[in-house]
A protein has these predicted regions:
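Core hydrophobic alpha-helical transmembrane segments of single-pass membrane proteins
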Residues: 1-5
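A residue-level detector for the "anchor" residue at the start of short, highly conserved motifs
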Residues: 6-266
């Protein structure tokens, strides 16, 4: 595993207007790959969307509950309304809050759904579960749920136990380092224009690079997919990023327009 750390800046801070979604009465906020955006919902809640994300919600937003559906990654700073819970629906879980700040990551191509709580409290439950079965998170906790386990009862996994079928079908609650500033934390690095990766194999990292730089990455052979990287990028162009990766671990690549072909150096 190789560590790469590069300083700089890369961010689009656009106020993204909502557009009409395919479903009648529903609106959508969308970010393309290579950009991030901030939006203000009708209730005063602020949402930051990471690259390649979509947020759907009812256009009146005046019901008994405030419900949104997320595909991708977003940070929510929810305005407290005691009698109107704010609910985020993802592909695997629902997150129910009153007023709080938290991050949710649920890209369709990712293996896990993750939510990290920074302020307040949240309840996490499967779509069909009642509130009585919800998992409570407190600040500085992160819940990680494999998507393959989304239809199974939520049960806490012990990270120190050997891998097993039962554990793989469970969620994990991890504690994040509360001594670090929010700008220094792994889970919210993207809010501060920093792409961080920890122990990612090249195939996993490629998905993040595709979203960050708006490129398409192809692997010419399977061998190179297993290379592991650890580090961060900010201001670097995609060309510079690949040069740093190549300097850490030898491999070949070719960039043509927005397409990148990667192959083994051996």
């Amino acid at each position: 595993m190789v560590c790469i750390i590069v300083a700089g800046w890369f961010w689009k801070n656009d106020e993204q207007p909502a557009v009409e979604a395919e479903k009648p009465g529903q609106e959508m906020i969308m970010t393309q790959n290579g950009s991030r955006t901030r939006s203000l919902l009708a209730d005063g809640t602020t949402v930051w969307l990471n690259a390649g994300s979509k947020l759907f919600y009812e256009n009146d937003f005046n019901g008994a509950t405030r419900e949104v559906r997320l595909e991708g990654e977003a940070f929510f700073d929810v305005v407290k309304q005691t009698n109107r819970p704010f609910i985020v629906h993802t592909s695997g879980i629902d997150i129910r809050v009153l007023g709080t700040a938290f991050n949710v990551k649920s890209y369709p191509e990712d293996k896990n759904v993750e939510t990290t709580l920074y302020r307040g409290r949240v309840q996490v439950l499967r779509h069909e579960d009642s509130i009585s079965k919800a998992i409570q998170l407190i600040p500085n906790q992160k819940l990680i749920l494999p998507k393959q386990a989304a239809n199974e009862p939520l049960k806490l996994s012990d990270e120190n136990k050997p891998s097993s079928k039962e554990i793989s079908a469970s969620f994990i609650i991890a504690h994040i380092d509360s001594t670090k500033k929010e700008s220094e934390r792994f889970e919210t690095a993207w809010l501060y224009s920093r792409l961080e990766f920890r122990g990612d194999n090249f195939e996993e990292l490629a998905k993040k690079l595709e979203r960050w730089y708006n490129v398409t990455i192809f692997f010419a052979d399977e061998k190179v997919k297993s290379l592991n990287f650890n580090g961060s990028f900010e201001r670097e162009t995609v060309e510079q990023a690949f040069k740093y990766l190549q300097a850490a671990i030898p491999f070949n690549y070719k960039i043509e327009n927005n397409e990148i072909s990667v192959s083994s150096s051996q």
